[in-house]
C-alpha cells in the first residue's frame, strides 16, 4: 500500500471514529511485544506455546485482531477484515453503517429457544412475534455475537472457489435472525461483532488447525478454519450459558483478495488449496465433536468454558490429528492470558 492509499484509509478511519464519537489507539508490534513480555513475567504458569510465539510471528491479520481482542477495554468489539468496505443500500445508494447495525444487534435481545418466522422480533423495525410464540419466551436473552454477511466476492473455501471462480453475492436481504440453540454455524471473521466481556475468551482467531507448523515458522497467520473454530467455540459456550447469537445484516462489500487476484481466481484458489486441504478435511470430524460437546455445570463463564473445551480437545481430538494437541495448548495459553489480563482490570 502506497502513502496516498494509507492517507486515504486513515481519513476513512478517522471519519468513522468521529461518526461514532470514538477514540483511536495505534498499537505497533513493539508495543505488543512489551505488553506480552510483561504479562509473561507476571504469570506463574509456563506453557509449551507462549503468547508471543502465537501472536507476534507474524504480527499481521488474525494475530493482530486476536491481540486487539485480548487487550481491549471495550464492552463491544466490532471487527472487519482489511479487504472489506461498507456496502451500499441498494435503494438509496447510501453507504450502510455496519458498526451501528452490529451494535443494534448486540444491544437487542435474541430468541434462541423458539424460532420466530418473521425474523428478529426485537429489531427496532420488526413487526414482533407471530401467533403461537410462547409469551414466556418473548423477553429473549442477551445477544453476545452479531455475525454480518457480505456482498461481492463470496467467502468460499478453495475447492468451491475453483468450481465457481466468477460467482458473486448480489442478493441483499434486510433481515436478522437468531441462530437456534443447538445449531452451529460457520463464522466468517470478515464482518463480526461480539460482547467481549461475555464471549470474548472464545474469539482467538489464530490456532493453525491442521497446519501447526505455520504457528512457528511465520509463513502463515492462520489456517482457513481458525475463525470457524472460534465460532464453534463461541456458539457452544453461548448455548451453555444461555446467550444468543444473531446473523444477517449488516452487510459489507468484499473485494478480491490478493491471493485470488494475482494469477487469476482459479490459480489463486489452487494455491490456497495446498494449505486449506487438510484443515477442511479435519472440519468433517471437528463439527460432530462440537455437536456432541457438553460443558459441565462448573463452567459458569466464557473463560472456564473455553478452558474446558481445550481439555476436551486434548483428550478427544489429538488422536484424530497431532495438530490438535498443539491447538489445545494454544487454547490453554490463551485462556490463562485472558484470565490474567481481566482479573487485573
Roles of regions detected by a PLM:
Residues 82:
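Basic, glycine-/proline-tolerant helical and adjacent loop/strand elements
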Residues 54-61, 219-227:
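Alpha-helix N-cap/helix-initiation motif
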Residues 1-21, 25-29, 34-37, 41, ...:
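Terminal low-complexity segments of carbohydrate-biosynthetic enzymes
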Residues 2, 9-76, 89-100:
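Active-site-proximal specificity loops/subdomain of glycosyltransferases
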Residues 86-135:
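Conserved donor-nucleotide/metal-binding helix-loop-beta segment in metal-dependent transferases, i.e.
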Residues 230-233:
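Short active-site alpha-helical segment characteristic of glycosyltransferases
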Amino acid at each position: 500500500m502506497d502513502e496516498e492509499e494509507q492517507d486515504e484509509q486513515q481519513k476513512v478511519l478517522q471519519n468513522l471514529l468521529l461518526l461514532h464519537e470514538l477514540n483511536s489507539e495505534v498499537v505497533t508490534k513493539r508495543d505488543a511485544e512489551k505488553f506480552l513480555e510483561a504479562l509473561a513475567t507476571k504469570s506463574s504458569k509456563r506453557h509449551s506455546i507462549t503468547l508471543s510465539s502465537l501472536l507476534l510471528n507474524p504480527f499481521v491479520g488474525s494475530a493482530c485482531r486476536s491481540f486487539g481482542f485480548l487487550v481491549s477495554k471495550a464492552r463491544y468489539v466490532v471487527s472487519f477484515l482489511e479487504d472489506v468496505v461498507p456496502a451500499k443500500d441498494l435503494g438509496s445508494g447510501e453507504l450502510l453503517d455496519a458498526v451501528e447495525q452490529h451494535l443494534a444487534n448486540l444491544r437487542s435481545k435474541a430468541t434462541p429457544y423458539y424460532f420466530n418466522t418473521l425474523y428478529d422480533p426485537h429489531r427496532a423495525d420488526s413487526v414482533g412475534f407471530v401467533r403461537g410464540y410462547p409469551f414466556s419466551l418473548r423477553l429473549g436473552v442477551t445477544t453476545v455475537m452479531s455475525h454480518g454477511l457480505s456482498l461481492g466476492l463470496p467467502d468460499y473455501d478453495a475447492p468451491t472457489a475453483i468450481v465457481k471462480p466468477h460467482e458473486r453475492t448480489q442478493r441483499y436481504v434486510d433481515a436478522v435472525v437468531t441462530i437456534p440453540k443447538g445449531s452451529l454455524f460457520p463464522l466468517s471473521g470478515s464482518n463480526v461483532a461480539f460482547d467481549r466481556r461475555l464471549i470474548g475468551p472464545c474469539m482467538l482467531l489464530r490456532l493453525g488447525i491442521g497446519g501447526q507448523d505455520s504457528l512457528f515458522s511465520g509463513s502463515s497467520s492462520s489456517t482457513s478454519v481458525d475463525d470457524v473454530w472460534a465460532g464453534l467455540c463461541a456458539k457452544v459456550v453461548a448455548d451453555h450459558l444461555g446467550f444468543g447469537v444473531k446473523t444477517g445484516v449488516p452487510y459489507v462489500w468484499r473485494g478480491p483478495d490478493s491471493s485470488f487476484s494475482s494469477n487469476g481466481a482459479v490459480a489463486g484458489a489452487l494455491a490456497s488449496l495446498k494449505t486449506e486441504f487438510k484443515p477442511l478435511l479435519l472440519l468433517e470430524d471437528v463439527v460432530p465433536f462440537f455437536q456432541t460437546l457438553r460443558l459441565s455445570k462448573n463452567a459458569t463463564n466464557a473463560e472456564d468454558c473455553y478452558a474446558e473445551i481445550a481439555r476436551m480437545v486434548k483428550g478427544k481430538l489429538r488422536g484424530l490429528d497431532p495438530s490438535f494437541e498443539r491447538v489445545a495448548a494454544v487454547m490453554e495459553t490463551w485462556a490463562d492470558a485472558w484470565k490474567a489480563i481481566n482479573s487485573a482490570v
